[in-house]
Swiss-Prot record:
NCBIfam families: PRK05461.1. Residues 2-126 form the ApaG domain. GO terms for biological process: error-free translesion synthesis. Disulfide bonds: none annotated. It comes from the Bacteria. PANTHER family: F-BOX ONLY PROTEIN 3 (PTHR14289), POLYMERASE DELTA-INTERACTING PROTEIN 2 (PTHR14289:SF16). This is Protein ApaG.
Amino acid sequence: MDVIQPCIKIQVHTKYIEEQSNPELQRFVFAYVITIKNLSQQTVQLISRRWLITDSNGKQMTVEGEGVVGQQPFIPSNDEYTYSSGTALETPVGVMQGHYKMLDEKGQEFITEIEPFRLAIPNVLN
């Protein structure tokens, strides 16, 4: 299994969901939109995901599962797949990172790393 696949690019956009959050109860909800761009010459399939979510107190949560949002999408060459999901933290700032396990046309599994990205309510410096 390859450690990294440079032909897959990941873009992440995050947003604080104020209407679902309750700071008094230490509940801060964030949405994220992820676009997976397949820059390779073959179709790939996203098989599973693994997230490490860390809040600003250092509390960590691992999330693993098949596919994303109930799907194991095929992503054709030079195409992209976008999905949205969310998470809740006990602090107003946190970080997510992880990886996708992918499968190429030859049946070879490889890992696509997802670089750390910040979850934060607006105007927080932490």
